[in-house]
Amino acid sequence: MDKKENAVLTVVGKNEIGILAGVATAVAEANGSVVQVSQIVMEDFFTMNMLIDVTDLNGTIHELETSIKEKLPRVEVHLMHDNIFSAMHSI
C-alpha cells in the first residue's frame, strides 16, 4: 500500500461568501480530498486550516495553490506538503 500524502492549507482574509466552497472546488478539480477543516470567523475576519489528501493529485501542490489563489484573489492562501509543515514545527 502506498503512503498517503497530505498538505496543509491556510486561508486568511476578510470574510466573504464562498471561500470554503471555492477551496473545496479547487481541491476536487485537482483530484485532492479534504480530510479535515477548521475555520473561525471573527467579525469580518476569516481563518481556515485544511488538511488535504494529495496522494492522487492531478498536478503539483504549487499548481493547486495557484488554482485556489485564482478562485479567491482577495484572501491569503498558503499550501505546503505536510513533510515541510512537520519539519518547520519540529525544530
Annotated model-derived regions:
Residues 1-91:
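A conserved regulatory-domain signal marking ACT and ACT-like small-molecule sensing domains
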